[in-house]
């Protein structure tokens, strides 16, 4: 799973740039890359929008029940 976060960082350039774009601390990005914790649904959605869909929210935050949310929207 950490591979997708490494690819996300590569997309933005650095962990600092990724953090700035996504509105989180650099230490949060480091935690994703190191597999310490996952990404929140809110940040996953933000990443999908900012990357024009290159990174899917479902892939960035697979534990969240996206299909349930879309069924009620």
UniProtKB/Swiss-Prot annotation:
Keyword check for Transcription regulation: yes
Keyword check for Transcription regulation: yes
Domain of life: Viruses
Molecular function GO labels: DNA binding
DNA-binding span(s): 15-34
UniProt keyword list: DNA-binding, Early protein, Repressor, Transcription, Transcription regulation
Cited Pfam families: YdaS_toxin (PF15943)
Role this protein plays: Cro represses genes normally expressed in early phage development and is necessary for the late stage of lytic growth. It does this by binding to the OL and OR operators regions normally used by the repressor protein for lysogenic maintenance.
Protein name: Regulatory protein cro
Name of the gene: cro
